[in-house]
Amino acid sequence: VADYTYSSTDKLILNTTLTYSHDLIRVSSYIDIDSSKYTLDGIDFDIPQVESPFSHHRNILSWQTSALWTPIRWMMINGQYMFEHNDNRNVSTWSAGIVFNLLKKELKLKGSTAYNYRFPSMNDLYWRPGGNPDVKPEEGYSYDASISYRKSINKHLLFDAEVSGYLMNIDNWILWLPKDGNQWVWTPQNKRNVRSYGVELYGKTTFHYGELVSSLSGNYSWSQSRTRKKQHVDDNAYMRQIPYRPRFKWNLRWNIDYKDAFFVWQMTYTGRRFITTDESYATDPYSVH
């Protein structure tokens, strides 16, 4: 990694980074196969063929440059460009955003947009069984905006709150799904073009008194991630929630710190998640605490 930052004035900061990485994966299969595990309710499923061990590598060279400009004290504009060379494939991505600090920096407004491109991971490509060397990269555009508020109620009490929303249009979204109806082997697949949008709420109250610090925080998220194109006339997955993406999630967290002692309590709720593209099967909601 090589990194360089230059600032001619307090209003403009430039940065550039050059990164190289070498990924290596070695894959082998289990040799002993228990055929009884491929029989369910008297139905015999195909036993997979054992493939020979192999290794694969890839070289990734990425260059990133960014600029942060503060034309006036309550506004910041940032932009970023990244070029990536990944095994003879060249990709450019970018992002741009703006931040407004208002009411003596108690109120903050943010917005950004970006073009995203994600290569499949080595596990997506070569995990055994199920890796798919032909899976395509994801790409698309994203937009997000947020408003946050931070207020000191008094010398002991601090309040934080934020509301944010986002929209993403992604082509070739990668999902791990059963291969050709075989429930035993799942493989990454490019499942259509997806539109994902949602809202997130966050709040936190912090109490300070001497060496005692206590905070109570919580967040709630609602998201809709649907396919936006039909693959055929009778496509039952069209405009359905994509698998494994719950519409609702929330959590609460309570922290107490005093000198070298601490206490943490947390509760997380995850809503129903569909496990098929036509929403015919789903997991029940659950909570953990």
Give the label of every model feature segment:
Residues 100-110, 137-197, 202-206, 210:
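Membrane-embedded beta-barrel scaffold of Gram-negative outer-membrane proteins
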Residues 2-6, 89-108, 143, 149, ...:
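Transmembrane beta-barrel strand/turn architecture of Gram-negative outer membrane proteins
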Residues 20-26, 61, 81-87, 104, ...:
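Transmembrane beta-strands of outer-membrane beta-barrel pores
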Residues 1-90, 162-165, 198-206, 213-221:
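Face-selective signature of the C-terminal outer-membrane beta-barrel domain
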Residues 1-3, 46-54, 80-85, 127-135, ...:
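Extracellular loop and loop/strand-boundary signature of outer-membrane beta-barrel proteins
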Residues 70-76, 159-169, 190-278:
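Gram-negative outer-membrane beta-barrel transporters
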Residues 1, 26-35, 89-94, 122-128, ...:
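Outer-membrane beta-barrel translocator domains and adjoining extracellular loop/strand segments
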Residues 2, 59-65, 92-96, 131-133, ...:
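Hydrophobic, lipid-facing positions within transmembrane beta-strands of outer-membrane proteins
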